[in-house]
UniProtKB/Swiss-Prot annotation:
Pfam families: MinE (PF03776). The keyword Cell cycle applies. InterPro entries: MinE, MinE_sf. Belongs to the MinE family. The keyword Cell cycle applies. SUPFAM superfamilies: Cell division protein MinE topological specificity domain. Prevents the cell division inhibition by proteins MinC and MinD at internal division sites while permitting inhibition at polar sites. This ensures cell division at the proper site by restricting the formation of a division septum at the midpoint of the long axis of the cell. It comes from the Bacteria. GO terms for biological process: cell division; regulation of division septum assembly. This is Cell division topological specificity factor. Keywords: Cell cycle, Cell division.
Length: 78
């Protein structure tokens, strides 16, 4: 393997990682412009806590083109 080949593979991997990070930042910025998002998350959290003994609740937001999604992952306790 040539010296350039070794560095080319690393920069390709680095470029992919940078692209994924940029997608994450852009997604966060797009969903940050939704004024009711924080209130919605608080209300969902209150309802889940009312009906379950959840040990873990995680919110994540995604944005693809012009579609924003809010994902909620709830780990239920015994």
């Amino acid at each position: 393997m040539s010296l350039l080949g070794m560095f080319g593979h690393s920069s390709q991997k680095s470029a992919t990682l940078a692209r994924e990070r940029l997608k994450l930042v852009l997604s966060h910025e797009r969903t940050a412009n939704i004024p009711y998002l924080e209130d919605m998350q608080k209300e969902i959290l209150q309802v889940v806590q009312k009906y379950t003994r959840s040990s873990k609740i995680e919110f994540s937001t995604n944005s693809n083109q012009n579609i924003n999604t809010l994902e909620v992952e709830i780990t239920l306790g015994n």
